[in-house]
């Protein structure tokens, strides 16, 4: 998937406004930055593009160095968000509060995992159906927004929730079953890979 799309407002078949709307309303492409270029400098034209979700709107004529700087800023912002989401899953000390995420796709993703959290059979295929995507599309989307696979996201979500349950006073076996692990021993092994501590050691901090 591209990180950024640059489009002229005036195009055959589909104008830039319609293209932006299609990109921003699709779960697969909603994270892609869109920059619209146009000779229309009127406030109404700019607002039409921004209302459809365009990340920037540049009127012609423009300086190439200004366009480059705007693109650089958008790509830097995307990378910052990607790093942030990646850290939420992979850093043991990162605060895990998916319900406050501003990204609709990620909120829906986390809610889907939580709904089946204690189901050992819940996996990527089921999660993909929950968010209305194919398995391949889900992996592509997660690679773009968090540089992670769907399998990794499910596993890390379960482990982060397990840590919360342990902090609430549940024992190791209870926490394991609550997040879909049928074997507390296997759960402890996977838990240690993320937190560098067994669940028992984690509760004794």
Give each language-model segment a name.
Residues 124-153, 177-198:
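Basic/polar phosphate-binding segments, predominantly the helix-turn-helix DNA-binding elements
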């Amino acid at each position: 998937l591209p990180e950024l799309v640059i489009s002229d407002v005036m195009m055959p078949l589909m104008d830039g406004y319609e293209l932006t709307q299609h990109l921003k309303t699709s779960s697969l492409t909603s994270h892609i930055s869109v920059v619209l270029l146009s000779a229309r400098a009127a406030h109404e034209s700019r607002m039409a593009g921004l209302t459809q979700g365009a990340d920037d709107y540049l009127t012609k004529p423009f300086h190439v160095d200004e366009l480059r700087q705007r693109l650089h800023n958008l790509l830097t912002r995307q990378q910052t968000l990607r790093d942030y989401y990646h850290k939420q899953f992979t850093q043991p000390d990162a605060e895990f509060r998916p319900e406050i995420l501003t990204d609709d796709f990620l909120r829906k993703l986390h809610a889907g995992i939580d709904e089946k959290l204690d189901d050992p059979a819940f996996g990527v295929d089921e999660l993909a159906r929950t968010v209305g995507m194919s398995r391949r599309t889900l992996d592509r989307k997660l690679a773009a927004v968090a540089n992670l696979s769907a399998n990794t996201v499910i596993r890390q979500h379960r482990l982060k929730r397990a840590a919360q349950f342990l902090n609430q006073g549940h024992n190791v076996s209870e926490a394991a079953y609550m997040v879909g692990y049928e074997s507390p021993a296997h759960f402890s092994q996977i838990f240690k890979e993320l937190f560098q501590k067994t669940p028992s050691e984690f509760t004794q901090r």
